[in-house]
């Protein structure tokens, strides 16, 4: 296993501060809360993106991982498979994760938006505002 600070320094992140205190492990209700959050995302209709999605892209990996990777929004492949970073960007992310001695199963991967914007356009500020509470709960 690599040292987190050394890895961050190697990729150009010179200053790293934990912004939140580590919290004690959640009780058994945390699993229920995670499932509840997944169901809320799955049934979300807060913005117009729900009309054009194939499915939501909640996130994948270890929900209690030390490493969290956040993308902007799902693309076509992610929308079809329901998993973030599965296209070319996913291959690159897999290589990056592997290079620091981790596997995809040891991290958590999510997007800010949980639905694909049409024609892979950039997310609108209003869409980000609607999805951000979901991401904050995932974090």
Where are these regions (language model features)?
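A polyanion-binding, active-site-adjacent surface
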Residues: 2-139
């Amino acid at each position: 296993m690599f040292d987190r600070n050394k890895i961050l320094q190697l990729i150009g992140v010179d200053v790293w501060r934990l912004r939140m205190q580590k919290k004690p492990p959640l009780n058994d209700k945390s699993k229920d809360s995670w499932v509840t959050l997944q169901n809320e995302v799955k049934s979300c209709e807060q913005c117009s993106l729900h009309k054009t999605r194939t499915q939501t892209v909640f996130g994948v990996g270890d929900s209690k991982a030390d490493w969290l990777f956040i993308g902007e929004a799902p693309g076509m492949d992610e929308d079809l498979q329901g998993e973030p970073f599965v296209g070319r960007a996913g291959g690159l992310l897999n290589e990056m994760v592997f290079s620091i001695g981790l596997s995809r199963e040891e991290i958590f991967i999510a997007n800010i938006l949980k639905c694909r914007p049409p024609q892979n356009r950039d997310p609108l500020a209003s869409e980000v505002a609607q999805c951000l509470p979901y991401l904050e709960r995932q974090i």
